[in-house]
Structure formats: structure tokens, C-alpha cells
Amino acid sequence: MPAARPEPQMSTSHVVQRVVLPTEADPEVLALYIDGDSWGTIAGKPVRLSNNNHIEDVLGRQRLRVRAGQDVSFASYFNAFPAAYWQRWTSIPQVTLTIRTSGPGTILVYRSNARGVTQRINSAQVSGKAVSEFALPLTNFIDGGWYWFDLIAGTADLVLEGADYSTTHAPNRTGKASVGITTFNRAEYCVEVVRMLAHEVGIESALDAITVVDQGSQRVSDQPAFPALAKKLGSRLNYITQPNLGGSGGFSRGMLEALNRPESDFVLLLDDDVIVEPEGVMRAVAFGRYTHKPTIVGGHMFDMYDRAQMHSFSEKVDRNRFFWQPKDWSQYRHNFAISNLRQTLWLHERADVDFNGWWMSLIPLEVVREIGLSLPVFIKWDDAEYSLRASDHGFSTVSFPGAAVWHVSWQDKDDYKDWQAYFHARNRAIAALLHSPYKRGGKMINHSLIMSVKHLFKMQYFTDELYSLGIADVLAGPSGLHDMMGTRLGDVRATAVRFPETVVIRDSAALPEPTINVNDVVPYTALGKAGLLAWGLTKGPRHFRKAKAVNIGERPQVSLTASQASWWALAGYDSALVSTADGSGKQHYRRDAKEFRRRLRRTLAQHRALRRNWTRLAAEYRAALADITSRQAWRNTVGLPQTGSSPTVSPKRSSRAASKSVASAKSAASSKG
């Protein structure tokens, strides 16, 4: 048991994680920082037995009051120490936990293993003003485990004055990060992200500059708060305007700017419409400095409107279907207010990932120099493809616990059917051509075809049009990708005017009454896969026959919620009124047999062509990759003068990677089936 000493001593240690509290009075978000409750289990599920998380006990960014006779645990997402990640990805043998307190009480220090088994490893009695230090070895965490501490107040309040985890080991990299924020007409959100970063105490030790790439017509610089931020940041704020080139264009510009800053070792990509935890930014940079070799360090995403709920703890690309997804669907949208760190056993196992979303992603500039910038695809799959490309070059991606942002959830979106459907279809196929290890892409082509046919059964002819355009552009090869960066979005949006179903009826008084009263829809779980197929085979053929005029007139047959509107439900009707995913209105879909037949023939032909030409296309895309992601190509696209600098991908790597890619594509017949 360490002795509590009255005064802190000077240290040359490097702080890698501070214990912090939320800056806003939001009780919901407090569960991500502390756990003051007692828990039990009912039927194997965690149940909170108390409600001791008091937002009014937060006294400052690093100060917390523990009421007399009560206890608080820092076994939380933001304040537990992810020991498993530090052991796996760095060479640090131990960290020191330093806790500064005032008042009487007890400190208990815990660790867990990969199975979530908790062990108390140390404790200290404190009184008055005290500083307690605990040496915590980073051993026996290879598969998982965390460190944390609890505070128990004595007969009077115990106040945490501050705490941190540090190391005396020198980092492998000492440079800072240049932030790259891409924004398009979210000026109010964007200026708030800059404000949160600018006002965090100590963040200047981690950040070299903040680059805002403004691609919209509603300028960030016109926001009332912008002049004061510009004055505070001075030369550290780099505000740029350019045409709308999507996320990949904006983030590539951020990479280009970071490469020109001698003090930067990293570029930190951030979305413009997030709430950022600045301490997480500092932790990501600290972790990135200590990794064995350059590593992409990603932050997790929480729901902006359900603050304790995480989107996904770890994500992968299913190489056979070539589709992104959580590594484990049972861990999807986990709510820490319902089950915190100590109650959630799977959170203790280290989770390795294939990629991390670019809502928050720290990329070493060594990686950028070697593998290039973003794929020129506007939006969708640029982040996943980049990590897959990095992996091909020996660079890993880590989704790092304790580094996170809050972002609007995908739950209120359905971008697979709106204008973004084009980018989903095209960019997924391009990423698969670049990285699939399977002969003719494995199951990817079949899965893409199935998705297209489902949209036809759902009478989503606009979506199918975009899918078709996307596949056609894939078949055209990689040479036109940069040329389309500034124009394809306009083409896609212009297509919508030809399709009446794209009109959202937002006035409830204007909603037509359905002719059929539907009380329920046949559920997937009741049918099973075999029953679902039978249902589709029964109802599908009607789409080849001309619909009755009465069924496709002003009144739809049925009115369905967004969750009811599955393909097997809509396959049985000639028309339907369907709610949008965000609940803002409804869209009127009508069946057209002639369109269905024409579109079905086209999508079958396109996917046959994709399968037939897969080996050739894979070789073309892989051979072109170094060029289309190079600094020269991107400087030309964003309108910057050429510098005559060396290629982004080193010649040795580029030649080897390109020849290897072409060879692997041409030998696909002998690879996995």
C-alpha cells in the first residue's frame, strides 16, 4: 500500500491520459465518465440498484466531489485506462497512476482481464491534501483488460482534485497533429467543434494547427463566433475554401496541408457535425506517439441525441460479401447508462478492427507519405478503403477506447435509398476490386445484385437508377474518378426530378388515404429464410404484370411505417405510402411493370459484365491506385499548383505494391473460391 504524501513532486513523466469530467450539465453523459451506482443482475442482465451519479458533484474539468459515506468508480468509458491496447500496440512496460485528493477517504485501484474478471490490486487511505501514486505494470493484458480506481468518502466529503496516467518512457514520435475538418453548410456545428478544441486547457501540446476546409455556400467564417476563435488561434487556424469535393476531397486537402507543416507528425480527420471530447483527441495523439510503428488511431462514435449510446465498438469488412459491419452485432448500439464498463464483460476483451470511420481518425503522416491520400470517391468507403490499403502496407488501425465523438445516429437515416445510393454502390465495388482476396470478388457481386433487386421489389426506381449509374462507372475504369469529383453529385441529384417517389409529403393534411387497412406486415422472424424466399417467389411475379390503374392512382393501397417497409412487405402491393427514416414525411411509391422488367434486365446485365470483367478491372484499379491517390493528382483536383515533389507513395513501395496487385488480380482464379 503506497503512502499518501502531502505535496506533489516534480516529474519528467509524460501524461498519456487525464481523468476528466464533462463540461456540460448533462446527467445522461455523466455515465461515460463515472459510475457512482450499485448494480445487481436479474435474469443475467445488469440492473442499477441506486442513482448516485450527481451532475452537481462535478466541480470542474478534473474535479469531482464524492459525498460523505458514498463511493464513486471511475470504471467508465472515458476514465478507465485501456491497458490491453497499450500493451498490444506500444512498448511501455508500466504507467503511473497519480491521484490528487482533498478530504478523508479511501482509494481502491482495480484491474480486469479479458473475461471481465475484476481484481483489486492496491489501496490507500487519504486525508487532507494528498497525492497518491500507483505503479501499474502493462503485463498480462495481451487479450484484454483495463485499470481504474474507486474513491470512497469518509465522514466528510472527499474531493478528487485531479488524476492522470503517465509514463517516464520517451515516445517514438514527438510531433503534433494537424486537425483536418471538412465542412459543407454546417457552419454553426463546425465553429463549435473549433471552439471546443481551442478552449481545452493543454491541447496545444497535442495540436499543431486546425485546418477547416469549407466546401459550402454558408461560410464558417460568417459565424459570429469565428473572429474571436481566429484571434485566439492565430496562425494555428488554417481556414480554406474550395468547391464541394465531398469528404474524400476535403480530408485529402487536410492531409495535403498537414504534410506542409514541419511540426506535425499526424493529421487528425474530424467531421464537422460532431461534439468532440478534446481529452480524447489528446489521448489519441499520445497513443499514436508511442505505438511500435505508425498506426491509424480511430475514435468511437456515440449518438448525439442519446449520449450514452455507442454506435459500434469495433468494425470489420466482411471480405467475402465485401460489406462493412460491426464485428459482433450483439455489441451494436451499446448503452453505457444501462450497462457500464464493470457490467459489460465483452468490453474488457481487446477488439481489433479493419477500419475506423473518419468521424475521428488520427493518421500518421508517415502512412500518408507511403500509401497516398484518400481514394477520389467523394463520400462512402473512403475511410474503410484507406485502412485496408494501409493494412496492405503493414500499417494497422486501432479503434481506441477513451477517444470519441458524438455524431448524429444512422438510425434516423436511410442513405442506401437516397442520392447517396450511387456512392454506396460504386465505391463498395471499387474497394472490392482493390482489396478483395476472392475470385471475382467472392459473394460481393451477388450481394450487390440482390440489393438492387430488393429496391425494385420496393418500387424504388430512383435508387435503382443510381445503383445502375454507379456500376456503369465502375465498369468504365479508374481513369475518370478525379474528373467526376466535382460533377457527379450534381448529376445524381438532377436524376431525382424524373422520379415522383423522391418527393417527400411533409404536410400531413396532404397525405392520401390508403385503400387497404393493413394492421400488420408478415415479420421476417415468423417466416424464416425459407419462408421468406417462398413469400418472395409468390409475390414477386406480380411485378412483371401491369398494375391495375386504380391501384396506382392518387390513393396508395397501403400506408407503412419505415420499419414495416421491407422488400417482402412491399412486394405484395402495387403502391404504398412509406414513411421516411427520419419521420419527416412520407413518399408515394407506385409499381410500373415496364420499368421493373427494363431495370431488372439492366441490373442483371451489368452484374454479369462486372463478373466477366472482374479480373481485368481489378488489375486496372490496383495499377492506378498509387497515381489516383497521389499528392500530384489531388493537388490538381483541388486546384493547387504542382510542387515537383516526389510521389506520395515511395517508388520502391509503389512499384512493388502495384506489381503485386496486378499479379494477385490476374491470379485470382487460383485464390479463394
Task: State where each predicted segment sits.
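Conserved donor NDP-sugar-binding/catalytic core segment of glycosyltransferases
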Residues: I275-D328
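A recurrent flexible, glycine/aromatic-enriched loop bordering the glycosyltransferase active site
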Residues: D328-M360, D414
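Cell-envelope/extracellular polymer assembly enzymes that use nucleotide-activated donors
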Residues: K176-S178, A209, E385
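Acidic donor-binding segment of Leloir-type glycosyltransferases
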Residues: L197-I240
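Terminal low-complexity segments of carbohydrate-biosynthetic enzymes
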Residues: P2-L151, R426-G673
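Short beta-strand-to-loop acidic/aromatic patch adjacent to the donor-nucleotide binding site
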Residues: P262-I275
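Donor nucleotide-sugar recognition loop
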Residues: N356-M360, L365, R369-L388, G394-F400, ...
